[in-house]
């Protein structure tokens, strides 16, 4: 999992991710993590890859622009710029998968799995 590698190797990202995930995950109980995987994974992909990408253009320019917007959505403070960079890169992967497969199910499933795994791992480590 690329996120785990980036988390270990980039201290600024690790700090930024911990702040963001603590803000979002700390108050949740374990069963809530299921919803944290499903709802943002589905709704964000429908918005950014299902609506925005076709509106901009089903091409790499559209993928780049929608991914930048996706990254900015994850900004929770100016010190959180590393998390925005990471979300933008992930958005490029999700957008590229939608563009190359012509199927929204691929990025939706990838996003849900990413959210579930990262939420579970963070919750285990930070309780």
Per-region residue spans from a language model:
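Transmembrane helix-loop-helix hairpins at the membrane interface
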Residues: 22-127
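Membrane-interface interhelical connector segments
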Residues: 9-26
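Hydrophobic core of alpha-helical transmembrane segments in multi-pass integral membrane proteins
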Residues: 1-8
């Amino acid at each position: 999992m690329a996120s785990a590698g980036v988390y270990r190797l980039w201290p600024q990202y690790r700090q930024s991710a911990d702040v963001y995930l603590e803000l979002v995950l700390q108050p949740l109980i374990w069963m809530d993590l299921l919803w944290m995987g499903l709802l943002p994974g589905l709704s964000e992909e429908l918005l950014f890859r299902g609506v925005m990408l076709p509106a901009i253009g089903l091409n790499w320019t559209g993928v780049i622009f929608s991914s930048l917007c996706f990254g900015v959505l994850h900004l929770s403070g100016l010190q959180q710029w590393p998390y925005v960079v990471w979300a933008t890169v992930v958005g490029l992967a999700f957008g590229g998968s939608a563009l190359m497969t012509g199927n929204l199910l691929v990025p939706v499933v990838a996003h849900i799995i990413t959210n579930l795994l990262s939420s579970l791992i963070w919750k285990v480590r930070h309780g």
